[in-house]
Regions:
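Long, highly charged, low-complexity intrinsically disordered interaction regions
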Residues: 1-22
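Short acidic, glycine-rich surface-loop motifs adjacent to enzyme active sites
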Residues: 118-131
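Extended, charged alpha/beta regions that create polyanion-binding interfaces
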Residues: 37, 42
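Divalent-metal-activated hydrolytic enzyme cores
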Residues: 95, 142-194
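Histidine/lysine/aspartate-rich catalytic loop segments that bind and position anionic ligands
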Residues: 58-115, 119
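Long, charged amphipathic helices and adjacent flexible linkers at domain junctions
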Residues: 44-64
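Charged helix-capping and loop-helix junction motifs
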Residues: 104-106, 135-143
Length: 194
């Protein structure tokens, strides 16, 4: 079954009908059970991760990857954080097309004000799998940075979620950590997100 799907990760993101189609010995009932089990596991992982502080872009990737990297349309969301960088809630901002999504800074910042968030992380996926930022991504990041300063809300990062490749299991781009390394503020024992 895993071999037919290509990988366990690919299998986990298939609909029940797709699972039944790739394996002749599995009917719709068993395929639906498998699909439900994968979804339950993904939800349990997100719940566990949501209790821990989000300190690095890798933490963002770990939290969002099961929900975002297999989406076929660009999806923009914000992770609202408290003063200890724990997740208050994720908020979906927009769903776009295969290669773009429209998000305005006011739509991105509105949930931070409504939910009284200390800060936020902007995130979106690239359905192509390549997390390299586009010029549009660069411009949006700069506009959101400027607007968040005016509102006094901490814009902690913009993370683009890609898909795993042959050379890396965690494929993402972070505007604050372009190399993906865990950076610390100069002279302090805390991560950049704090």
């Amino acid at each position: 079954l895993i071999q037919s799907a290509g990988s366990l990760d690919a299998l986990a993101h298939m609909e029940a009908a797709e699972i039944a189609n790739i394996c002749k010995g599995i009917g719709m009932a068993k395929a639906a059970t498998l699909s439900a089990a994968f979804e339950l596991g993904a939800r349990a992982l997100r719940e566990t991760l949501s209790r821990q502080p989000i300190q690095t872009p890798e933490d963002v990737y770990d939290y969002l990857t099961t929900a975002m990297r297999w989406k076929e349309k660009e999806t923009v969301l914000v992770l609202l954080l408290d003063t200890k960088c724990r997740l208050i809630k994720p908020v979906e901002i927009s769903i776009g097309t295969l290669n773009e999504s429209i998000a305005h800074p006011r739509d991105i910042l509105r949930p931070t004000v409504i939910h009284n968030a200390y800060g936020f992380i902007l995130a979106h996926n690239h359905p192509s799998g390549n997390p390299a930022p586009s010029r549009t991504d660069d411009l949006l990041t700069e506009r959101v940075r400027e607007c968040s300063k005016l509102l006094g809300v901490r814009f902690l990062d913009h993370v683009i979620i890609g898909k795993p490749t042959e050379t890396t299991n965690k494929n993402y781009y972070s505007y604050n950590h372009p190399g993906g390394e865990r950076l610390k503020d100069p002279g302090q024992e805390r991560t950049l997100y704090h």
